[in-house]
């Protein structure tokens, strides 16, 4: 191109993206060079010359799946040897097998191993209620009882939105 522009190309695979650094004055010229001739130049060329140029310059285009295979990192599957014998050591121990990763949380059995069942005592139930009420008061959240649970509660009176009888029918027979 010219001395002001530079181009970076990946060496491991066909370049998918071309990076060009240029100034605003030469931008149009560089874009035209990268994308091909303008429409005026293409119309001015003879049809025979374009057929010969396309036959010579035509390269096999790479298909999408071929480009993706080139860009995809290779995955390796490591199988254990045939003489694999499980031992009593945990995977986190340094037994030479450093490829295994352990969870920082641990297994579910180790999480629930410290739990124990406490049979309910009548005193523990009242202390839980007292603790709950204390926490509610500290946070200034009060659970008000429903007015329906109070003695002497009667159902609210439903007001009629629409008249039950027509005013015209009551005045005339």
UniProtKB/Swiss-Prot annotation:
It comes from Arabidopsis thaliana (Mouse-ear cress). It comes from the Eukaryota. The gene is VQ31. GO terms for cellular component: nucleus. Residues 154-165 have a biased composition (Low complexity). Its main location: nucleus. Coiled coil: none annotated. The modification Phosphoserine is found at residues 92, 103, 146, 149, 166, 170. Pfam families: VQ (PF05678). The modification Phosphothreonine is found at residues 46, 165. InterPro entries: VQ, VQ_4/11/13/19/31/33. Residues 76-105, 143-173 are annotated as: Disordered. Phosphorylated on serine and threonine residues by MPK6. This is VQ motif-containing protein 31. Residues 86-105 have a biased composition (Polar residues). A motif (VQ) lies at residues 27-36. May modulate WRKY transcription factor activities. Keywords: Nucleus, Phosphoprotein. The keyword S-adenosyl-L-methionine does not apply. It is found in: Nucleus.
């Amino acid at each position: 191109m010219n001395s002001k522009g530079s181009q970076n190309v990946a060496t491991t695979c066909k370049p998918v993206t071309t990076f060009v650094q240029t100034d605003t004055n030469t931008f149009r010229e560089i874009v035209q060079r990268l994308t091909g001739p303008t429409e005026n130049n293409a119309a001015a060329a003879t049809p025979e010359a374009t057929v010969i140029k396309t036959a010579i310059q035509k390269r096999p285009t790479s298909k999408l799946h071929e480009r993706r295979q080139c860009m995809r990192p290779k995955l390796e599957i490591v199988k254990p040897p045939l003489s694999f014998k499980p031992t009593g050591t945990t995977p986190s121990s340094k037994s030479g097998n450093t490829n295994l990763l352990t969870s920082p949380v641990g297994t579910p059995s180790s999480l629930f191993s410290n739990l124990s069942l406490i049979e309910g005592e009548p005193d523990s139930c009242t202390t839980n209620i007292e603790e709950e009420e204390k926490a509610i008061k500290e946070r200034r959240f009060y659970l008000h009882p429903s007015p329906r649970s109070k003695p002497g509660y009667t159902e609210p009176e439903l007001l009629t939105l629409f008249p039950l009888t027509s005013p015209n029918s009551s005045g005339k027979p």
